[in-house]
Amino acid sequence: YKFVSKMLDGYANVLEVGCGDGFGGTLVADTVEHLVGMDFDPLFIENATNLRTESDNRSFIVHDILEAPLKNRFDAAYSLDVLEHISKEEESLFMENILGSLDDNGTLIIGMPSLESQDYASIQSKIGHINCKSGDELKTFCKNYFHNVFIFSMNDEVVHTGFTPMAHYLLALCTNPTKG
């Protein structure tokens, strides 16, 4: 979330796809004008809404991105720890609906555990992580939807541009959508 908050600093209208309880979005909300947290689980959205403060620049909505894009358009979107839970059969729909929710010049950041990190993941994590990717696979996937894709690696809290097979976590910064 620190990386996202720095990369999207100053953006006006940002969407978090798969916000869960909204906890991580508080860092991003500090650097953007308005943050919309979206999740398919009504319980998550209820909890996130209850944690808001009066001065909070966030709102939350229940929506399944696999069903349709949002009607509103956003300058940027981010989705952390979501794509690895989306089946390969539905990953294109996931990206197309995010793209359909972005302005023509929208930016997207996707974060996920690396494929290589799964050798060290718990059994519970492995069960839910049905679509982890290597750095090269994530870049290739994102290049289907964006002209510019920059892959960053992360180990602990250190973000770098180093050798992705040694990364525990991957971040894809995607700009200049291929749509429209």
Task: Please name every model-derived segment.
Residues L70-N72:
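Glycine-rich phosphate-binding loop signature in dinucleotide/nucleotide-binding domains
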